[in-house]
């Protein structure tokens, strides 16, 4: 069993994510338009929401955890912290080295996705911080296992995946996305080097065997467009 996964993202008209690179809007202010995206995200009312590691560390926890003993537990099991919020914040940390200054992001309790080889000292640190965790295979990158555990152990029925492009691309490749909630910012990036909405860094075609069905189109304030698509897995 997996949660319903909605990829909720805002991009420029050329599909780029770096807001600092976007042109200024013709109507309104950039922060106001980004606020529309945030408001739509709250409407989705998912049980949990998720960032990729780079996005989280850049905005919240830039420091790295260091330990001289990298010995893992022989049989690691998921851990649910004693006190958790109604909504959860999920973070994929295949390096098992984020130094957390808080057990929450925007008031939502953190659940870390880790490799089974995570150092025992790091797991002990997370428990002392009141941070829940689960495992995604030996390398920490098996999203299918992670999502199954998130649903079956943590009771998450819906997840809002909010970038960045690398984690979106990984979920796309795994075939785990059920719906795309795409908010189009009325501006352009134009740079070939900017991260795209889906920025898969592996080999092959991550979207192979998948099709999109348009569910709805809404024109929001100041030229913002909200598109919703359903993913279909082609047999």
Label each residue range with its predicted role.
Residues 1-235:
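Enzymes that bind and transform nitrogen-containing heteroaromatic metabolites
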